[in-house]
Amino acid sequence: MLSHSQKVVRLYRKAIKSIRDYSEDYDMFLLNAGDLRASLKAGKNETNPFAIQQMVKQLEDFNSYWEHPDPYIPCDGINGTKWQRNTAPAKYAVDPTNHLLENGRE
C-alpha cells in the first residue's frame, strides 16, 4: 500500500508527463508545469483529511482527463524508435576460446 506522499508524487509525475505530451514547445511546458506545481504547493500544508482527499481526487481526475493517446517515448527508451535496433550479439555467439584468425594470426 502506498503512503499518501508516494501517491501524490506518482500522480504529480504522471501529470507532468501528460503536460509534456500535450505541450507544443518547452516554454508552454514550463508554464503549464509551473501552474500545476503552484496548485500542489498551495495545498501542501492542508491538515483537513477531507480537503486532502478532494485535492488528490482532483489530481486523479486531471490525469485521467489529460492522458495522451499517443504519449512521447524517448528514442532510446523501451519501445522507442531506436530500442533494440543494434543489439549486441548473444553472450557466447562467438567461441571465446577460439579467437585465432583462419591464417593463424591473432
UniProtKB/Swiss-Prot annotation:
UniProtKB keywords: Electron transport, Membrane, Mitochondrion, Mitochondrion inner membrane, Respiratory chain, Transport
Membrane topology, as annotated: Peripheral membrane protein
One biological process term in Gene Ontology: mitochondrial electron transport, NADH to ubiquinone
One GO term describing the cellular component: mitochondrial inner membrane
Subcellular localization(s) per the UniProt record: Mitochondrion inner membrane
Claim: Transmembrane helix is one of the keywords in the record: no
Similarity comment: family membership: Belongs to the complex I LYR family.
Described purpose of this protein according to its UniProt entry: Accessory subunit of the mitochondrial membrane respiratory chain NADH dehydrogenase (Complex I), that is believed to be not involved in catalysis. Complex I functions in the transfer of electrons from NADH to the respiratory chain. The immediate electron acceptor for the enzyme is believed to be ubiquinone.
Subunit structure: Complex I is composed of about 45 different subunits.
Protein's recorded name: NADH dehydrogenase [ubiquinone] 1 beta subcomplex subunit 9
Organism of this sequence: Dictyostelium discoideum (Social amoeba)
Gene: ndufb9
